[in-house]
């Protein structure tokens, strides 16, 4: 059975996560405030960041950078900026 939450990113009610995707208090906040749709948006941004900045998840500093960008995107309304990337026009 799906849960409905008020999504911080989308600013509307949406389907919530099925389980906590991230550890600790931040993970609890994501579970309670971030919808599946918004999490999918973040995953796309995260993949771009990892690829364009050549981040390694084995590197503690790279993981910290990714977590900071995730917080900015999910909770502060700031889009991920990747130098040299131009989004496709619709």
From Swiss-Prot:
Signal peptide: none annotated. One of its GO terms (biological process) is cellular response to oxidative stress. Keywords: Iron. GO terms for molecular function: iron ion binding. It comes from the Bacteria. The keyword Iron applies. One of its GO terms (cellular component) is cytosol. Could be a mediator in iron transactions between iron acquisition and iron-requiring processes, such as synthesis and/or repair of Fe-S clusters in biosynthetic enzymes. Belongs to the Fe(2+)-trafficking protein family. PANTHER family: FE(2+)-TRAFFICKING PROTEIN-RELATED (PTHR36965:SF1). Monomer. This is Probable Fe(2+)-trafficking protein. The lineage of its organism: Bacteria, Pseudomonadati, Pseudomonadota, Gammaproteobacteria, Enterobacterales.
């Amino acid at each position: 059975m799906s849960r409905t939450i008020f999504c911080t990113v989308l600013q509307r009610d949406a389907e919530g996560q099925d389980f906590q995707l991230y550890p600790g208090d931040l993970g609890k906040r994501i579970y309670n405030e971030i919808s599946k749709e918004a999490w999918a948006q973040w995953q796309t941004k995260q993949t771009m960041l990892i690829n364009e900045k050549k981040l390694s998840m084995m590197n503690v500093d790279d993981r910290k950078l990714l977590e900071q960008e995730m917080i900015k995107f999910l909770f502060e309304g700031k889009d991920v900026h990747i130098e040299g990337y131009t989004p496709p026009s619709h």
